[in-house]
Structures are given as structure tokens and as C-alpha cells.
Amino acid sequence: MPISKIHARYVYDSRGNPTVEVDLVTETGLHRAIVPSGASTGQHEACELRDGDKSKWLGKGVLKAVENVNTVLGPELIKAGLDVKDQTAVDEFLIKLDGTANKTKLGANAILGVSLAVAKAGAAEKGVPLYAHVSDLAGTKKPYVLPVPFQNVLNGGSHAGGRLAFQEFMIVPSAAPSFSEGLRWGAETYHQLKSLAKKKYGQSAGNVGDEGGVAPDIQTAEEALELISEAIEKAGYTGKMKIAMDVASSEFYKEDVKKYDLDFKNPDSDPSNWLTYEQLAALYADLTKKYPIVSIEDPFAEDDWEAWSYFYKTQDIQLVADDLTVTNPIRIKKAIELKAANALLLKVNQIGTLTESIQAAKDSYADGWGVMVSHRSGETEDVTIADIVVGIRAGQIKTGAPARSERLAKLNQILRIEEELGSNAIYAGEDFRKSVTL
């Protein structure tokens, strides 16, 4: 079924920055996708095209990317007359039109908007939900797997004030009997955490960050983990609710001396307290003994390969590569060869097309890695990643706290999918690391 119209415009993301929205029309109607954007971005990811005109949107405009859809990608794709159900052919066509290694010419944000809108049109033409279409494209087996929602309830690092260096502390309801129950456990724990934070750190500690987590004036990871453990206990889930961290350590790595500065937000940070990777690894090991931590993302900097491989040998928890791999097939291959991690953080806008995202997941699965599908800190009401996580059987999703509509939009979509699939779906639960094999 041919595409009759493709039109892009700019809309705003959850941080008030412009982003790209693409409308695509076929005989089945209008299919729309909005592209997200990240705050702490890895230097190896696909190019998000921004205008750089400081007189508008502080340089973050996307008029050029929008124009690239309206004058190049759209017209050329319509002219090519490709079948919207053939996602691979469409994405290869878009990649070829751009012609650069990391989509610098037309912008990954322009290309991804078109790619995701095409996927929605393809699903509509087949008369199936998007997750079913993604499942066909990825060739995943049935039953469907519903993901464990990793809920980012406490923020530090670049996402918050206070001296806390680690960026995200997540609660993980892997022992829940279903997705909906896991989400309920998370919401109840989040409410307990919020009231504890206000009690201990004052009213403003209840304010939420970009992803809906609270950001009290906390100094150390231990202090954060104590507070979360207390909230879990108050909610009645001690022993059942697990914890995960995204350290985002590239943000506080001192490349010149190859050390990690946990006091990086203090301009007078004392270099004698900076840690070698062995010392930082020992700190993580201590924390995992003390608290029910099941997953650590970006424990080391994005090019500190030696540290990753060292830590990998000593740990059996999930080690998630985000800045290290940025969903890039070449980086993923290297991480697998160097035995640096055992799970991939999949962000569709880091690579720029649905086909490449699916391939990144498959490459990771092939080596026994887990895959966690992720939102970005600049999100929108678009829920495509909810369908992707179910379609590729990833078994884990990270999409913020159970707060702020752009985060809940994804979680609510998975609730709908759970209801629709009924007994044709299983909850990944404790098997979230190997859900693709369930």
C-alpha cells in the first residue's frame, strides 16, 4: 500500500525542547511518531541534528531536521513506492539517502521519525497491533513476554543537585506475579519514598527530576540506598523488591588521570579522594553485598574498557552497557569480544532506525546478553518503545518513575497490552535477563 503523504513538524519534549514529529498517511489512515532526546549523551551515538541557532530555542531547534523530512526523506520515500510492511527495505533506503556512518547529513532524529511512523503504518496494513508487527520483524517466538518495569525513583548525578554522583536508583519488582502487580508495587514504594524524603530532607525533597524520581540533597550512594530500602520496607516489599543503579560514570571520569571523582559537583573536589577503577569496583561490590542490587548500568566510563572487563570477571549481577555501546553494532561487537558487559541498553534514537534497533537486540541475545529497552530523559507522549519491548521479548524496560505523563504513557501502554494478550503473555519476572529464551 503506497504512502500518500509524509509531513514533519516540530513539537516539544518533556523538557521544553523542540523535537521531530512525523505524520505518515496511507490508505489505513494517519500514522504518527515523535522522536525523544537524551541529556547525558554518549559521544559515539548517531547524530541528533540541532539547528545551533542560539537566537531560537537556545540553539536546540530542529527546523533543519524537519526540513530534511519534508524535502528529502518524505518525497524520496514516496517516490520509491516501497511497501510499508517491509521495514528493512524502508530503513535501508533511508540510511542510503543519508549516506554517512552516523546519520550526520539528514539527522538520526529525522530518519527515526520516518522509520517509526512507517512501522506503525505497516502494523495497520497487516491489521495487527504494533508489538505484533515488531515481533514479526524480529522473528521472536511466542508467547509474548511482558517486561519488568525498572522504575527510576531517586535521581542524582547530572540529573539532580546535591552531591550524589550516581545518576539513577531504580526499584525492580521482579518478584511480582505480573506486570500490573509489579507496577503497583513500584507505585506504592514510590509514594513511601516521597513521603520519607520530605520528612528527612524537607518539603522540597519531594520535587521530581526529569524522569519523575525524587532528588533529595543526598551525598552518598549508601545514603540513597538506605532511603530506598526503608521505603521498600514501609511498602511491605522487603525481600521482594530489588534495586538497580545507573551510575552514568562517564559524567565523573577524569580522563587525564584515569580516576573517578564521586564529588564531581563540588568545584573544590579533592583529587586525593578520586578513585581508581579497582577502588570503584570494590565500592560496587560492597554495595551489592549490602543491598539487593541486581543490575548496574554504566559502572565505568565509555572508553574505560579495561575497567569494564575487570569488573565483569568478578560479578554475576547484570552489567548494562549504555554509554559504552550506544546501541551501535560495532561497539556491541567489541564489548562482547572483550567480555565487558552482559546486557545492552537499547535506545532507538541512538542508532536511528527500527531495523538497526532490532538487529542490535538480536546481536546481543546471540551472545547470551540481556536487553533493556530505554526511554530518554527528554520524552514525549509517544509510546512506541512499549510495543518494541514486548515485540522483541526484551523482558525489561526503563522508563522513569511512576510519575509524569510522558513516563506513564509507556507503562500504561504495557498495561493495555497485558490486558489484550491475557494468557498469551508471560511476565519476565526473575528471568528478566534471559527473557528472550523463555
From Swiss-Prot:
Pathway(s) this gene product operates in, as recorded in its UniProt entry: Carbohydrate degradation; glycolysis; pyruvate from D-glyceraldehyde 3-phosphate: step 4/5
Catalytic residues (positions): E211 (proton donor), K347 (proton acceptor)
Subunit field text: Homodimer.
Annotated residues for binding of Mg(2+): D246, E297, D322
Family named by the database record: Belongs to the enolase family.
Origin species: Cryphonectria parasitica
Gene, per the UniProt record: ENO1
Protein name: Enolase
InterPro entries, per the entry: Enolase, Enolase-like_C_sf, Enolase-like_N, Enolase_C, Enolase_CS, Enolase_N
Gene Ontology molecular function: magnesium ion binding; phosphopyruvate hydratase activity
GO biological process: glycolytic process
